[in-house]
Amino acid sequence: MRRKVHYVIQPAYLWSSIAEMARTQNGELLHTLQNGFDYIENESFASTFDGLFSEINLNSEKLGKDYTARNATLCTVIKAIADGLEKFSTDKDTLGDAYEYLIGQFAAGSGKKAGEFYTPQQISSILSGIVTLDSQEPATGQKKHLESVFDFACGSGSLLLNVRHRMGPHGIGKIVGQEKNITTYNLARMNMLLHGVKDSEFEIYHGDTLTNEWDSLREMNPAKQPRFDAVVANPPFSYRWEPSEALGDDMRFKNYGLAPKSAADFAFLLHGFHFLKQDGVMAIILPHGVLFRGGAEERIRTKLLKDGHIDTVIGLPANLFFSTGIPVCILVLKKCKKPDDVLFINAAQYFEKGKRQNRLLPEHIDKILDTYQHRRKEDRYSMRVSMERIEKEGYNLNISRYVSTAEVEAAIDLADTHQQLVDIEQAIVRSKDKHNAFLKELGLSLLP
């Protein structure tokens, strides 16, 4: 049975049983819930989901000072959830969407901490829209199937699920993610399950991306190394790291050099890019500094450009994230790309202002994706820039160098302007003479 449905849960641990215990204020609810968590981790999913509920502490004094108080609190909370769920459909799409909504609401309320685990859905939609288009001929539309998609800083998994939503439930062979934070790692696994993704269809690894702790990614045989059709990521911005000397010879970095200790942005980028297939697409969110900073970052950026790997640079509005108000960019990379230019999209002015965060509306997202797909040129919005021009700019990718949003001032005709001033002065003289005539009739002082 497990082979067919992938997991088995005993009747006592089903939601309906737990909810009934809560309604009847059953004194064994807490014990049953803990036993259910242990069963799911150790037996229901075998070793695949070991530690899934490790961050849930049912003995926390926040629930109550003793067992009875904690049990009563759990009864109240679970009954309220059960009563609420009765009003909605219980299919996996609804449950998954509800879970995603709660993650989003938690992110909105947790401020800067949200950047550790959540990518706003509007931005996820842009990245997923890009990587699901045909890599060599985006204008031909979306791919029918992706063998694999990879997010090496997956947080709660929302970005990976956005790609899956775009491709459909059977459009991706394998969803692969990696997350360093244990709590967020568990959130991602739960998120997959609640969206109906089978345990055989995804793999989330808990470990450090930069040190490459995942054994399957450390395979030295190129023929056996994993490669992905699509790579998406929203890594921590300008993360401080301590690269060892040995990392300089790491297969991910040795052709480009190490990112500076003060900002691991390019280290994250090179990690994902290394595992991209030859015909794959990578879309990564980064701070604007990667476009123009000097030193080691300039050397990495220059080599990526000279090798023809940077396909598109997209500038987004400021204050889109819960964790930071700075504007960010999306870099689209390919190992084999047809155009010998770089597409720049300056979407910084296209947003709806909100009280706490700015928002991208569907039309803003569609405009970005349509411009990328058809490589359109538009005044003050997008431009295809040749490598010769980029070389002249010192391989600086600052978007405003190529696509300025400033409106061109209209040319002033000096002769015409002079004539207008003469006409105005003559009109003033005529009006004053007429006014003085009235004043004279009234016996009043005239205007000088």
PLM features: residue spans?
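Conserved S-adenosyl-L-methionine
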Residues: 116-233, 238-240, 247-255, 267, ...
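Generic hydrophobic, helix-prone segments enriched in Leu/Val/Ile
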Residues: 34-37, 176, 198, 258, ...
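Non-catalytic, mostly N-terminal accessory regions of nucleic-acid modification and defense proteins
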Residues: 1-136, 200-203, 209, 315-318, ...
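A conserved structural/catalytic subdomain of Rossmann-like adenosyl-cofactor enzymes
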Residues: 212, 216-218, 222-448
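Short helix/loop capping segments that flank catalytic or ligand/cofactor-binding pockets
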Residues: 89, 162, 186, 353, ...
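Short small-residue beta-strand/loop micro-motif enriched in glycine and branched aliphatics
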Residues: 107-110, 171-173, 352-353
